[in-house]
Swiss-Prot record:
Keywords: Acetylation, ATP-binding, Nucleotide-binding, Transferase, Ubl conjugation pathway
Protein family: Belongs to the ubiquitin-conjugating enzyme family.
Source species: Arabidopsis thaliana
EC number, as in UniProt: 2.3.2.23
UniProt-recorded Gene Ontology molecular function terms: ATP binding; ubiquitin conjugating enzyme activity
Annotated PANTHER family: UBIQUITIN-CONJUGATING ENZYME E2
Catalytic activity: S-ubiquitinyl-[E1 ubiquitin-activating enzyme]-L-cysteine + [E2 ubiquitin-conjugating enzyme]-L-cysteine = [E1 ubiquitin-activating enzyme]-L-cysteine + S-ubiquitinyl-[E2 ubiquitin-conjugating enzyme]-L-cysteine
Record protein name field: Ubiquitin-conjugating enzyme E2 7
Family annotation (InterPro entries): Ub_conjugating_enzyme, UBQ-conjugat_E2_core, UBQ-conjugating_AS, UBQ-conjugating_enzyme/RWD
Amino acid sequence: MASQASLLLQKQLKDLCKHPVDGFSAGLVDEKNIFEWSVTIIGPPDTLYEGGFFNAIMTFPQNYPNSPPTVRFTSDMWHPNVYSDGRVCISILHPPGDDPSGYELASERWTPVHTVESIMLSIISMLSGPNDESPANVEAAKEWRDKRDEFKKKVSRCVRKSQEMF
């Protein structure tokens, strides 16, 4: 019998196929595994990432939606809120409840009402406006703040590379 998580993910995938959302596309990495999705984010207009096609893997836990998925870019990504291994660091992907380090309110963290669509729109928003207050990539955050030209060059390289890979 299918689990609550797999049924919910099947429904979300079906909804996204029927009603695509601007800015990203999503599908399964392997048709037999509803818990691992392949997503492509289109670099948002009027941002440094414009024109890019950034691939990522979204991995859902067995107890979804009670726990958040992880999202990891497989395309090169230079951003203050993306770890060097590609993992995305935004509040809504952090486990529910209080933040042990005190940076985030519980209301900013994961809740079961989030969907693939709301996660992807949050990531697109992150690309539009990095949060350099609690960075995953300290070097990118420093460049974003202090050496914007260097930051832009690195992002431009990522965009060009993503276009070549697409």
